[in-house]
């Protein structure tokens, strides 16, 4: 908007050049998964050009085994996880091209933008009481029985600019067997493994916590299409971290059923007005660095069930890289693809020094649950 007099709006880029968004990068030696994950973490934390549509795709060459990768970064205002995955699916081989491609339209004149901004300001002031009421009601509806004070841990410190990425992998079918045995969901199984893994790392630090507050996604979408914008909210849930993994899973499955019943989308409705209000006073980053509502994020996406191909090459793996912010130094992203379940672990290595140990603990938790749920054959 001109002179910063209103909220940003979407306009067509009449001078769009694909070279501004798609780049090629050689992976540093030795070109293995570890090196690729370091490249991906750096790309995700590299600021997007705000003067253009906020997305970037980087083709990473020089990987072992003749492989190459594509690291796609979307700003959260452009697409949430579901929308981003839908966009990527449309790039895969086998889908027909778009039926029609709309020509770009010129942006509105400055006077119209200024008039619209002034109108929005007047409406915002008139609707302020209702906005505050929705925020209060949304908090009440989405956080019943949830403490606003997550346990204090040394992993919850203001984060810096660096990130590291690692991935734990298990067969999706085996996880479904575990979930079925405990009347749980696949995501419940991951949550049980995540809380156990974080507790294991904290115990090494001399911190004996028994519960964690985990933020899980709540979709406000009506479909899984590639609509513009972010339509996902969050739901903070107090989950057990101590005790036997199977008992913990049973407890988590019960808690998640109770928390999700009748509350889908409640927190999504309050996030936009709440953060808009905080942004007005420049308090967003201050609050995120000091928040005591959650300990970690766990996002989950259902990816393609069948293997994909891109430019004729088989897509061997798909990994989600979600960001961390404020004083949440560790976050987890869950994505299924072609019979596998990938759980990415992204962390600030200056706060979470035990990133490799945390990933190994997560892999151990998942594998142990699978082994105990699989009938022995003899």
Residue ranges of model-derived segments:
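Soluble acyl-CoA-dependent acyltransferase catalytic core bearing the H(X)4D motif
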Residues: 1-328, 334-340, 345-363, 367-378
């Amino acid at each position: 908007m001109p002179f910063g007099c209103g909220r940003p709006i979407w306009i067509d880029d009449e001078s769009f050049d694909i070279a501004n968004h798609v780049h090629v990068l050689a992976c540093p030696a030795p070109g293995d998964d570890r090196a690729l994950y370091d490249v991906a973490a750096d790309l995700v934390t590299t600021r997007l050009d705000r003067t253009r549509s906020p997305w970037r795709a980087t083709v990473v060459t020089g990987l072992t085994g003749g492989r190459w990768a594509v690291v796609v970064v979307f700003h959260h205002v452009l697409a949430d996880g579901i929308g981003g995955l839908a966009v990527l699916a449309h790039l895969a081989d086998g889908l027909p091209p778009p039926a029609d491609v709309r020509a770009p339209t010129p942006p509105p004149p400055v006077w119209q933008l200024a008039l619209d901004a002034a109108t929005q300001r007047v409406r915002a002031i008139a609707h302020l009481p209702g906005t505050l009421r929705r925020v209060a009601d949304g908090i009440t509806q989405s956080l019943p029985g949830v403490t606003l004070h997550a346990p204090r841990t040394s992993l919850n410190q203001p984060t810096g600019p660096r990130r590291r990425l690692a991935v734990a992998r298990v067969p999706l079918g085996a996880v479904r067997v575990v979930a079925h045995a405990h009347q749980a969901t696949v995501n419940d199984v991951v949550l049980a493994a995540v809380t156990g893994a974080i507790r294991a790392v904290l115990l090494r630090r001399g911190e004996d916590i028994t519960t964690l507050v985990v933020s899980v996604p709540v979709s406000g979408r009506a479909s899984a299409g590639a609509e513009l914008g972010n339509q996902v909210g969050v739901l903070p849930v107090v989950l057990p971290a101590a005790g036997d993994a199977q008992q913990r899973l049973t407890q988590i499955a019960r808690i998640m059923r109770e928390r999700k019943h009748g509350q889908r989308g409640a927190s999504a409705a309050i996030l936009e007005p709440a953060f808009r209000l905080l942004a007005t006073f420049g308090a967003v980053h201050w609050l995120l660095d000091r928040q005591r509502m959650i300990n970690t994020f766990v996002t989950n996406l259902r990816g393609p069930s069948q293997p994909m191909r891109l430019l004729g090459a088989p897509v061997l793996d798909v990994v989600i890289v979600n960001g961390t912010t404020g004083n949440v130094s560790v976050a987890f992203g869950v994505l299924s693809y072609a019979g596998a379940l990938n759980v990415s672990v992204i962390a600030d290595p200056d706060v979470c020094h035990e990133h490799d140990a945390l990933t190994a603990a997560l892999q151990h938790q998942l594998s142990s649950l699978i082994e105990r749920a699989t009938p022995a054959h003899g």
